[in-house]
């Protein structure tokens, strides 16, 4: 799972200017959805639907910053109850409060592999934490792939797969990238220099005929 990735940001959906060979391979060898729509445009509630199979208005997570309902089970809990090893590595955003998470593994997931964004920040020095949350200034030579959250999530995922390859397992790898601040090491930080997406009519929509809540999420002021 990636964060804030539009359909036109991957090659398998027709944008040949995007170089995404691994995602394209997943689409070729797995399932590529042509008519899939999120039930909620906000991160936390959308994730709550994916991992519980229930609508946000049913599971209690109607906006960011609030936790799932206390009696709501995730897919990790249900599969663990049936003897399947479950791992969750990456951004969680379902425990309420801080965007980065609480650093605590919820019920139903392997605590040895739990690695939300709070866990990542705990590994960094004070200066590194500042760097990790700034807009991309990553042209300096000491900025490495190993520094990024995505790289560290991937390393843990590989270890999980190696450990449980002979067992029934369910693994979620949830990258915060390409969500801002969009840190990107070389050589990827120059691959799309000068590239611009085609403008969308939705970008200039003033939303005056849309529900008030939609206007609020877009930053409009109440009158």
Task: Say what each PLM segment does.
Residues 10, 33-36, 61, 68, ...:
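Short clusters of hydrophobic/aromatic residues that line enzyme substrate/ligand-binding pockets
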Residues 2-4, 20, 38, 52, ...:
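Ser/Thr-centric signal marking residues that sit
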Residues 12-17, 30-52, 67-68, 88-99, ...:
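Short, solvent-exposed turn/loop segments enriched in Gly/Ser/Thr/Pro and often Arg
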Residues 1-31, 40, 80, 186:
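Active-site-proximal N-terminal segment of extracellular/periplasmic enzymes that hydrolyze or transfer
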Residues 49-146, 193:
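Catalytic-site neighborhoods of secreted/periplasmic enzymes
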Residues 31-34, 82-85, 166-170:
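Loop/turn elements at helix/coil->beta-strand transitions in domains of secreted/extracellular proteins
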Residues 22, 71, 75, 153-160:
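Alpha-helical packing segments of well-folded alpha/beta enzyme cores
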Residues 4-17, 116-155, 159-223:
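Active-site-proximal cap/lid insertion segments
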């Amino acid at each position: 799972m990636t964060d804030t990735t539009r359909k036109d940001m991957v090659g398998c959906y027709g944008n040949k200017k995007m170089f995404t060979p691994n995602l394209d391979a997943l689409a070729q060898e797995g399932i590529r959805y042509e008519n899939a729509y999120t039930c909620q445009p906000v991160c936390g509630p959308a994730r709550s639907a994916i991992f519980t199979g229930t609508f946000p208005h049913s599971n209690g997570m109607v906006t960011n910053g609030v936790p799932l309902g206390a009696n709501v089970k995730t897919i990790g809990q249900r599969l663990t109850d049936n003897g399947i090893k479950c791992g969750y590595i990456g951004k969680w955003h379902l425990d309420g409060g801080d965007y980065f998470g609480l650093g605590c593994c919820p019920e139903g997931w392997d605590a040895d592999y739990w690695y939300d964004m709070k866990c990542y920040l705990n590994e960094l020095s004070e200066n590194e934490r500042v760097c990790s949350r700034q807009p991309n200034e990553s042209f300096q030579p000491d900025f490495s792939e190993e520094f990024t959250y995505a790289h560290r999530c991937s390393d843990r995922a590989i270890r999980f797969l190696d450990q449980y390859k002979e067992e029934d397992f369910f693994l979620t790898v949830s990258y915060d990238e390409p969500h801002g601040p969009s840190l990107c090491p070389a050589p990827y930080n120059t691959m799309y220099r000068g590239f611009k997406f085609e403008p969308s009519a939705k970008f200039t929509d003033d939303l005056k005929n849309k529900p008030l809540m939609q206007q609020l999420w877009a930053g409009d002021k109440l009158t």
